[in-house]
């Protein structure tokens, strides 16, 4: 399927290849240089503790202005987006958060990227519904597909993630992916994401 048209913010969206965002909020900063993620989510960690060349997502209230560090918001913080003038802002939303008012903010603020999350039993359907909702509203915000797992078995994680992400990517949805898993090393999760993107190119 053709990829959904999204605007470009920095190098996310448009015709840029989908990005990988690695969730390192657990404080694990070991990387496999063969599969270096495009962005790293560090949660409440102090961005000063990491090298400048890492592009970091930092929880908005812990964010500090420095090269390559971007604030990460949750749905309840939508009204705070306007207080930050940075080239990129990330906000984690679910399908249910996409009210008319929220969509209006996403349309107006061209620096925003949505991290689309789901707690729904049928996550694929929920994320697909969210993408169709954005399309119907004429909202071209770039969207990163996000999933949470609790898998200790690497193969089970790979299979589950390949279906959950791959189905939507092959439908033309998603300007990147972000996978959080309790149970495996973070480098395993990263290589799983790179594998999914290679398989869906």
Where are these regions (language model features)?
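Catalytic alpha/beta core domains of metabolic enzymes, predominantly
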Residues: 7-13, 67-70, 76-79, 85-201
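Active-site loops and adjacent core secondary-structure elements that bind or stabilize anionic groups
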Residues: 1-78, 82, 88-95
């Amino acid at each position: 399927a053709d990829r959904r048209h999204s605007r470009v913010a920095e190098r996310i969206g448009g015709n840029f290849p989908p990005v990988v965002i690695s969730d390192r909020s657990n404080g694990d900063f070991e990387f496999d240089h063969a599969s270096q993620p495009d962005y790293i989510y560090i949660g409440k960690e102090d961005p000063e503790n990491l090298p400048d060349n890492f592009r970091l997502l930092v929880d908005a209230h812990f964010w500090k202005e420095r090269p390559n560090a971007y604030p990460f918001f949750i749905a309840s913080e939508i009204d705070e987006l306007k207080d930050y003038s940075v080239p990129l802002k990330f906000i984690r939303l679910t399908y249910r958060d996409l009210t008319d008012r929220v969509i209006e903010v996403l349309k107006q603020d061209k620096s925003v990227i949505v991290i689309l999350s789901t707690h729904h039993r049928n996550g694929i359907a929920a994320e697909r519904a969210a993408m169709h909702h954005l399309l119907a509203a004429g909202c071209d915000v770039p969207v990163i597909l996000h999933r949470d797992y609790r898998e200790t078995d690497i193969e089970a994680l790979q299979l589950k993630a390949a279906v959950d992400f791959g189905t939507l990517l092959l439908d033309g949805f998603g300007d990147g992916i972000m996978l959080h898993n309790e149970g495996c090393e973070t480098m395993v999760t990263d290589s799983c994401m790179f594998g999914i993107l290679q398989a869906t190119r």
